[in-house]
Structures are given as C-alpha cells and as structure tokens.
A protein has these predicted regions:
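Structured loop/turn residues at beta-strand edges in well-structured enzyme cores
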Residues: 1, 160, 183
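Membrane-proximal basic amphipathic "stem/tether" segments
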Residues: 1-3, 15-21, 207-265
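N-terminal anchoring/stem segment of glycosyltransferases
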Residues: 2-12, 34-37
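Metal-dependent polysaccharide deacetylase catalytic core of the NodB/CE4 family, i.e.
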Residues: 6-13, 23, 65-68, 76, ...
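A solvent-exposed, charged loop/short amphipathic helix patch at secondary-structure junctions
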Residues: 19-29
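C-terminal domain-boundary segment and adjacent tail
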Residues: 27-63, 155, 181-201, 241-265
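Short, acidic/turn-prone active-site loops that include or flank metal/cofactor-
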Residues: 98-103, 192-196, 210-212
C-alpha cells in the first residue's frame, strides 16, 4: 500500500490576513493563500492518477492500494469558508482533523460547520482536545483523555462515532497510537513523511507530507506523482528534525526555521 497524504492547515484570503486557526509565527508558516491552494488543486487534478481518496475508518484502507489523501489539521474556520467548496466542486473528499476545545471559538469552525462537512461526505476526525505542545510527553492517562474527550465531543456533534485522527504537532509515539486505539480510533495520521501504512496494536498508522507556505508548486506535482526523489528528501529532513527535536532549545528552533525555508514542515 502506497498512500501520499498531504497535510494542509488554513487558507487565507491574502498573506496579510490571519482569520483562521491558531495565531503566531509557527502557525503562520503552515497557512496558504487561497490562490496558492487553488493552484495546488489544479495541479493535483492534472497529475494525480486517481481522484483523492476518502479514508474514514480501517475498512476504507483495505480497499485502497495506492492514492492521494488531502488532510487539514487544527479545525480552522477556513475549512468550511474556503476549503470545502473548492473540494466539493471537484467531488473530492477532505479529511478535517479538529482540535475539539476550540470548536466555535474565533477563527475556528463551529459545530454547525462540522455537521455540514460530515453531511457533504468529508471525514471529520480528532486532532486532540487541547492540542498539547508535545502530546507524546504527557502521562499515558492524559493522552487517553485528550483522545477520549475530543472524540466524544465530535461524535456528539456529528451523531456518529469518530474513527480517525491526526497527531497534534507531529509528536507521535507508541503510547499516542495505543491510547488513540483505546479511544475508538482505527486510523491515525502522523506527520512522518512516509507513504507506508503500518499496524500498531490494531490501529493503522498513516504517514503524511507537510505543505507549508514555502512549498513550491513543483514540489506539489512531485508529491502528487509520488516521485522517489521527493519522498526521500522529505524522509531525510524528517530524520534530522527528529534528532534535533530531542535536543530542543535553540538548535531545534534553528533547524525548524531552515525546514520552513526549504518548504518542509
């Protein structure tokens, strides 16, 4: 199985606005203009072998041998105001992973927005309850509470169980996967740039490729076509990122800044 999953966040009217999702310099690095997003969608339509896939639960993966998945993290307001209509005009599904404590707050989607996405056939999943800075470093009981609280809130809004989620901040660990499984999640998306799907104690773990404001149009085409060189580049940079993450401090800040400049989140 070879899946290319792209991670998007928020779409802004222009580079100077900031009316969707979390605020701050780090968050801004992942926010695109709608013009850039429109270009990406056009390139995906031209270069993808098939239309983007919909993976809402484990059984969906059994039917997918390869393909492209579009995912959107955090639950910013642009999910319904700018993203959904663009996907729906092409009959494409999106995967919207929502930080449940922020539902209805300024800059984030409301319960009504989530129901609209669900009714339109998009996947609405969890992105934790509070978006902890490093979820993998929390006590296991607290990680489980993040998943349980988020899934319960979203399920109550949608009227159906939540089976998919993405890891906030990319801080994945085995405990993060196991607690997600215990909360009823069967498909967990990470930020590790891999096209492989692994099984961790009964939960499918799916890698993803980050899209930042510096990601070039050429790179979107290469990712869409799953070219070996671009996949290897993302893997190499991710390996360096993991090493420096463990060190933290100024070294991590410097590396993260350089990764953004290279267009790799």
């Amino acid at each position: 199985m070879k899946l290319i999953t792209l991670i998007y966040h928020d779409m802004l009217v222009d580079a100077q606005s900031d009316d969707s999702g979390f605020s701050g310099e780090d968050a801004a690095s992942y926010k695109l203009t709608v013009a850039a997003f429109d270009r990406h969608l056009a390139m995906i339509a031209k270069h993808a072998a098939t239309s983007p896939l919909r993976i809402g639960a484990l059984n969906d993966l059994s039917e997918a041998s390869a393909g492209l998945i579009l995912s959107f993290d955090d639950g910013g307001a642009s999910g319904t105001s700018r993203v959904a209509a663009r996907l729906e005009s092409r009959a494409w599904p999106g995967h919207f992973f929502v930080t449940s404590n922020f539902i209805g707050q300024k800059g984030f989607m409301s319960a009504t927005d989530l129901r609209r996405l669900h009714a339109a056939g998009h996947v609405v999943g969890s992105h934790s309850a509070s978006h902890p800075t490093r979820i993998s470093r929390l006590p296991q009981a607290q990680i489980l509470a993040e998943w349980n609280d988020s899934c319960a809130r979203i399920a109550d809004i949608l009227g159906s169980a939540v089976h998919s989620a993405s890891v906030p901040g990319g801080f994945y660990s085995r405990a993060v996967a196991e607690t997600a499984r215990d909360a009823g999640i069967s498909v967990l998306f990470t930020s590790e740039p891999t096209s492989a799907v692994s099984n961790v104690e009964g939960i499918a773990v799916v890698g993803r490729f980050s899209v930042t404001r510096r990601t070039s149009d050429k790179e979107i085409v290469a990712l869409t076509e799953a070219r070996a060189a671009i996949l290897a580049r993302h893997q190499l940079l991710w390996g360096a990122k993991k090493i420096v993450k463990r060190v933290g401090g100024r070294a991590w800040i410097a590396v993260r800044k350089r990764l953004f400049e290279l267009g790799v989140g």
